[in-house]
């Protein structure tokens, strides 16, 4: 057989040296844009129906929950993260046209990143961005920065208004930080917003704080996990086979920076389960509706919502902290051994889960 030959068009199919992939969705479609140290970040939302009551305060209350500088355990970068709605809203209601939203960057401190301009940081996108595109914005990670999620949060605020009208509720909280896990028996929704980690277990939150204090003292950080519960989801959302609800949820969540794993229902625990304990048995409620006695499947069967609560779990990796005696590489590929630490790189976070 002859050897395959690839023409210049193969670069298009393999991704080329342009950055595509900033748009997600079908009916309700979002495109996030901007870099950590650019003029601003934002999102364009396409597919929002006309007539939805919407103002900047509706968006701002969501952004205020993720903005930096609210806790000693998150990045100290000070940003107001004030949203500006540029289009798609008139006299307090959506017009059905694309909604563009902007958040201006204010506290970039780009000079803090000048030392790492020619280095690849472990655990960051520095290396792959440079190898793929031949050029990268090293200031705060550029497009791979956590500030990319501002656009997602702003779009999510609109989505939540639509879902609220449909009676669909979403609850998200931190399940674990390091080895400290919220006890389901101590679940208290009222304490989620009362601790800096959004944990539903007050005792676990206290222990998480002590654990992160120790991490910070050692110039280290921690990973964690987040759980999400979607309630009142109607039956029948999702299509086999490549448009499964589970697959689309996974794509959306795994595209968030620092997310390394995604689970639905019992998730990875099913690898250790037996069939007779894992299968959700059916019964009927007093109205004759078919319901499940358990929910190991997490509310999705065959990629289609079954009407029960949808349970999601996300694993988040720790941030880069001090890496004593670690090996770094310069852009020209010379290996460099740092006996004490890599070059300092701006703002740091002890644990990402809160945001």
Question: Where are the regions a protein language model picked out?
Answer:
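A structural-propensity feature for long, helix-poor, extended segments
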Residues: 69-88, 181-184, 191-202, 215-216, ...
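Short, Lys/Arg-enriched N-terminal segments with co-localized hydrophobic residues
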Residues: 3-18
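Alpha-helical support elements that line or immediately flank enzyme active sites
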Residues: 39-51, 147-168, 243, 247-251, ...
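Glycine-rich, N-terminal phosphate-binding loop and its surrounding beta-alpha-beta segment
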Residues: 63-122, 126
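Short acidic, glycine/tyrosine-flanked loop/strand segments centered on an H-E-D-like triad
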Residues: 117-142, 325-346
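Glycine-rich anion/phosphate-binding loop at the beta-strand->alpha-helix junction
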Residues: 33, 39, 219-222, 226-336
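Glycine-rich, mobile lid/loop segments that gate access to catalytic sites or pores
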Residues: 131-241
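N-terminal, positively charged regions that mediate nucleic acid binding
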Residues: 20-77
């Amino acid at each position: 057989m002859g050897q395959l030959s690839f023409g210049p068009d193969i670069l298009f199919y393999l991704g080329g040296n342009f950055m595509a992939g900033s748009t997600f969705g079908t009916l309700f479609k979002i495109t996030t844009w901007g870099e950590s140290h650019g003029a601003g970040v934002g999102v364009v939302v396409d597919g929002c129906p006309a007539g939805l009551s919407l103002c900047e305060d509706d968006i701002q209350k969501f952004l205020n929950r993720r903005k930096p500088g609210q806790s000693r355990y998150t990045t100290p970068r000070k940003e107001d993260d004030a949203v500006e709605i540029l289009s798609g809203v008139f006299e307090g209601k959506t017009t059905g046209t694309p909604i563009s939203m902007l958040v201006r960057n204010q506290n970039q401190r780009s000079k803090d990143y000048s030392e790492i301009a020619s280095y690849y940081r472990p655990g960051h996108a520095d290396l792959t961005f440079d190898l793929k595109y031949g050029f990268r914005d090293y200031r705060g990670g550029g497009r791979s920065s956590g500030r990319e999620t501002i656009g997602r949060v702003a779009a999510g605020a609109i989505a939540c208004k639509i879902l609220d009208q449909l009676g669909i509720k979403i609850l998200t909280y931190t399940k674990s930080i390091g080895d400290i896990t919220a006890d389901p028996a101590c679940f208290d929704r009222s304490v989620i917003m009362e601790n800096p980690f959004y944990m539903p277990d007050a005792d676990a939150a206290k222990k998480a704080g002590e654990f992160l204090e120790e991490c910070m003292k050692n110039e280290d950080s921690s990973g964690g996990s987040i759980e999400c519960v979607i309630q009142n989801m109607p039956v029948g959302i999702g299509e086999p086979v490549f448009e499964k609800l589970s697959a689309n949820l996974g794509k959306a969540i795994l595209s968030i920076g620092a997310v390394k794993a995604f689970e639905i229902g019992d998730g990875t625990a099913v690898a250790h389960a037996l069939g007779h304990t894992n299968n959700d048995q059916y019964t009927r409620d007093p109205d004759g509706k078919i319901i499940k006695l358990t929910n190991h499947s997490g509310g999705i069967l065959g990629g289609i919502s079954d009407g029960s609560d949808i349970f999601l779990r996300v694993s988040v990796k720790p941030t880069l902290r001090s890496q004593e005696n670690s090996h770094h590489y310069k852009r020209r590929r010379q290996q460099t051994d740092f006996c004490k630490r890599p070059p300092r790189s701006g703002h740091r976070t002890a644990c990402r889960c809160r945001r």
